[in-house]
Structure formats: structure tokens, C-alpha cells
């Protein structure tokens, strides 16, 4: 079995945010308990390596019963959604489980093209996150506030635009807010801007 997930920030050789790893534990445990042999696939910056983080990931997940594919973004075919790359990637697996809502909008080989070669399934976290979004979208606009932050305005702006008529107010923070502040003439000093 093959699972797509993002391992998040690390500093000084240590994982600094373990929430995302813990969040996929339910799916991993479910698959392992049913006899699956799991390979986790993820990215960690464009050039980072998982090798120094493997022990920490195993400790967080409470198991060593998986293999960890090296940083998928190191491979040339990944970000261009190369079908030949996806076909090669898929050869060793029987199914594909996506538990990575945060990157599911990307047109990458390990998210899109691979589903042409393996039966795709949603992991428990992905199902939960889609359900949460569905619930928010079904709520009345009145009293609804969207809070959005982080970096990569190119991925956040379509979300903001989509929610303009679905939320009463939108609060923007992080590097996304810095873009709006800078355009408005505010001196953001050395703050991150995307």
C-alpha cells in the first residue's frame, strides 16, 4: 500500500511540528492492522531529506512497520505531473491512499498521475478535512468568519476569492497579510512576503 502525506517543518535536524504526522496515524494503523505493507511518501522542502528524521517519525507514529520514500520533490517528474514517473512509482504498490488534504490541490505526479495506475483511496484524515470544509460551506454566511494565513498567496488567493460571498468576514494573517499590507503602503520591514 502507498500513502501520500506531508511531513511538516523541521529545524536543526528535528521535526518542529508533529501534528500532521500524528494526524495520519489513524490511517496508518488501520492499514497495518489489516496486513498492509506501507510506504509513506511525502515532501520536505524542495531538497530536504527524510533520512535524519526517520527515527523521530517512527517514534511519533509509534511503529517502525513502514518504509519512507525519500523526498518526492527531489524527483524531476513529480512537480510536472509526469505520467511515466508516476507509472514507475506505482509499480511496487497495490493501492494508493491520499491523506494529504493540504497538498491535494497540486497537479503533481504523486497526487494526480499516480491515480491512473493505482486504485486511489482517501485516508481518514483527508475524509475528515473534506467533511469539515463541507460543513463550513453549508453554514449560513451570517456570522461566518474565515481565518486564513501562512505563505504562498498563489494558493490562498483563490480560497479567499471563493469565500468572498460565503463568509461575513475574512481575517488574513501571516505572509498572505503581508502582501495586502505592502500593497496598501505599509512598511512590513523584513517580514516574509510571497
Question: For each of these PLM feature ranges, what is it?
Answer:
Residues 1-194:
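Active-site loop-to-helix "anion-binding N-cap" substructures in soluble metabolic enzymes
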